[in-house]
Amino acid sequence: ILQSISKFVLAAGNLFSGTFKYTSAGLGGTGAVNFGQKYFFETRPTALQVKYRAKVEPVDLNILKGPLEKDTQDKARIFVAIVDWTTQHTVSSTYVLFGSNNGCVGAWDPETTKNPGEGQIIGYGSLWLTETTSASDWQNAKIQIQWYDQTTKPADGNYSLVISCAANAYGDYMNGCSKNYLHIDDT
């Protein structure tokens, strides 16, 4: 269960392949997500299949100047990326009460970025969710992978797989609805 929460800032419910580190700093801190997992592919995948349930409501927080205005429809998101990265890609969100260095660094989108700096994105699949589903019925999704490169495969030992499921698509900007949730099963 991925659930958004808000005390002073928005903590987007997020499930992803990679690591997370939080560093406290007075009345706030920095959360750093390191995207990417080493994974060996025998064959090239064509899609990511998941079951999901979601509650997606209008935006009530926009702490770090994200793209969604308050009272507009929030978005949840599930995406997969097949990558050829030498290191994980880091996204850092910093918020300290009365701080002057608040912001988001490293945000990326596989739909619009072919290389965020660590190596190329070979292909991606993305599902944007803007509506609440039934709380009791699981929705089936088959997220097709779109290929930027039809032949390259990740180098042995490189980071090759990114999966991200977020109750708030722009949670790295602390931008979204604090009441959203996204339940994921059968990935």
Please annotate each region the language model reported:
Residues 1-44:
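Surface-exposed, low-complexity/disordered Ser/Thr/Gly/Pro/Asn-rich loops and linkers
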Residues 2, 38-57, 64-70, 83-85:
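Solvent-exposed strand-to-loop "edge" motifs in beta-rich extracellular domains
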Residues 48-52, 56, 145, 157-172, ...:
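Extracellular beta-strand-rich recognition modules
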Residues 61-64, 92-93:
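Short, solvent-exposed loop/turn and secondary-structure capping segments
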Residues 67-72, 176-178:
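Short consensus segments that form the blades of beta-propeller domains
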Residues 77-80:
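Mobile, glycine-rich extracellular loop/lid and propeptide segments
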Residues 87-156:
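Extracellular carbohydrate recognition and processing domains
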Residues 135-137, 153-156, 168-187:
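Extracellular carbohydrate recognition
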